[in-house]
């Protein structure tokens, strides 16, 4: 997706600012993000991935599930159990790395209407929420994986960039 910012863009390494207006503009942004996420076959998308420094994310775990927007999310609690899974990212296309994350999470946020929302999630949903909140804090999956996997991923990204430049 040409809208999604790629690895190396400074906005992806910056902490996003809180949302303070819950209006039609925000609701339009949520709808746009949901559409881009779906078009890219993603399960989550954070505003910084579109170059927007706002603490806003959308996610959907399962094709039949509704899209959920979390505005200004804050992790209240994570379970002690962690699990390693291979994660990918729309901002780092073609790369998947192992990331350890808590299996359970509780997050307090607001929805796009401004209503308070408490989300208790496990498994894939918990992982997606934590991944997207990382984006709001300027953290990427390459920051959460092993040094070896990070090196290999960066090498693969450089090779893809070189191939793209040669094709152009």
Where are these regions (language model features)?
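Positively charged
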Residues: 1-168
């Amino acid at each position: 997706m040409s809208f999604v910012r790629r690895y190396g863009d400074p906005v992806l390494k910056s902490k996003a600012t809180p949302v303070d207006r819950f209006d039609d503009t925000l609701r339009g942004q949520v709808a746009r993000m949901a559409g881009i996420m779906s078009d890219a076959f993603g399960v989550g998308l954070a505003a910084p991935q579109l170059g927007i420094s706002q603490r806003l994310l959308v996610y959907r775990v399962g094709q039949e599930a509704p899209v959920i927007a979390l505005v200004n999310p804050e992790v209240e609690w994570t379970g002690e159990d962690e699990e390693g899974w291979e994660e990918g990212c729309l901002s780092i296309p073609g790369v998947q790395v192992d990331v350890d994350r808590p299996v359970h999470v509780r997050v307090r946020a607001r929805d796009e209407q401004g209503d308070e929302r408490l989300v208790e999630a496990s498994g894939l949903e918990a992982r997606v929420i934590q991944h997207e909140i990382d984006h709001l804090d300027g953290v990427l999956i390459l920051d959460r994986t092993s040094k070896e996997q990070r090196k290999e991923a960066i090498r693969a990204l450089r090779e893809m960039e070189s191939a793209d430049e040669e094709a152009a």
